[in-house]
């Protein structure tokens, strides 16, 4: 066997249907598009969300709220993820160095999820009550 002699197994490949190539093909004349109308023409399609002229659902529903820009620079870190940080001090830069958070994050809150086994010192990060209890139970401490 050589690379230049390889070919797919017999019957595993189907030739694409050639549209508009005679009556005998089964897809001649109109080519499966029916007769007349917008969708029979080339480039004839309606934009997504168009409902034939009636007021679209997107416009019938009221506007609601907004997307907070603060969410783009804020993150929650689980207690279990603190184990990924090398060293005993956990702060914004050490979390970024350990790839726990992305580089554009400015505000971090540590939440209770999972377990922590090593004693760490948390500096300059917000911490929930449950996470604070878990960190202190493991021998760590929280510094502002």
Curated annotation (Swiss-Prot):
One of its GO terms (biological process) is translation. The keyword Cell membrane does not apply. Residues 21-31 have a biased composition (Gly residues). It comes from the Bacteria. Pfam families: Ribosomal_L27A (PF00828). Residues 32-44 have a biased composition (Basic residues). Keywords: Ribonucleoprotein, Ribosomal protein, RNA-binding, rRNA-binding. Residues 1-57 are annotated as: Disordered. One of its GO terms (molecular function) is structural constituent of ribosome. The keyword 4Fe-4S does not apply. GO terms for cellular component: cytosolic large ribosomal subunit. Binds to the 23S rRNA. Part of the 50S ribosomal subunit. Belongs to the universal ribosomal protein uL15 family. This is Large ribosomal subunit protein uL15. It comes from Vibrio vulnificus (strain YJ016). The lineage of its organism: Bacteria, Pseudomonadati, Pseudomonadota, Gammaproteobacteria, Vibrionales.
């Amino acid at each position: 066997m050589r690379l230049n002699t390889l070919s797919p197994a017999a019957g595993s490949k189907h030739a694409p249907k050639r549209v508009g190539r005679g009556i005998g093909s089964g897809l001649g004349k109109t080519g499966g598009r029916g007769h007349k109308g917008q969708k029979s023409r080339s480039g004839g399609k309606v934009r997504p969300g168009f409902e034939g002229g009636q007021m679209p659902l997107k416009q019938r529903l009221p506007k609601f709220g907004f997307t907070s820009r603060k969410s783009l620079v804020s993150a929650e870190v689980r207690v279990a993820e603190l184990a990924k940080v090398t060293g005993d001090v956990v702060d914004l830069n050490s979390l970024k160095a350990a790839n726990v958070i992305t580089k554009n994050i400015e505000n971090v809150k540590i939440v209770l999820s999972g377990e922590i086994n090593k004693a760490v010192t948390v500096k300059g990060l917000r911490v929930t009550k449950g996470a604070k209890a878990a960190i202190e139970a493991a021998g760590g401490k929280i510094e502002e």
